[in-house]
Amino acid sequence: DLFERHGAPVEEKHFPGKESQSMEQALDEIVKKLELGEEQFETAAVVLRTENEAKKAAHILKEKLQAAGFDTENRFSYLHRDSASFCKGLTVTTFYLAKGLEFDQVFSLFPKADRSTLSRQGRYIAATRALHKLHMYEYGK
């Protein structure tokens, strides 16, 4: 372990298969595991490696959440480098924009094949954003 955590155990999961297909499976899992609401958490984040991956995930997640009845108008943000702010609820962003922010629940979503130093740092940054619940997800081969 890189560091000591308190709270719920970390959920680690790999979604094997083609990258786009396995990423979508991981996003389905996030929709299922998301704990936002009055009796749950105020903030959650999906933290990804690159802006392209974050943009794609935000688009797919927004559609899935709307279909599930989630208030994406007021409780969903895609945080990118030109964003001025983001709302309480679910934020989708990259690890380098998440640096310095904290969320009640964090889903780290990285391609399994990327074991570069930068990707390891990204996973570490994502992991240290979680206040209460951390889900470390990998997708692809």
Residue ranges and their predicted role:
Residues D1-E29, L36-L48, L90:
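Inter-lobe coupling/hinge region of RecA-like P-loop helicase motors
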Residues F3, E35-K141:
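Core RecA-like ATPase module of SF1/SF2 helicases and allied nucleic-acid translocases
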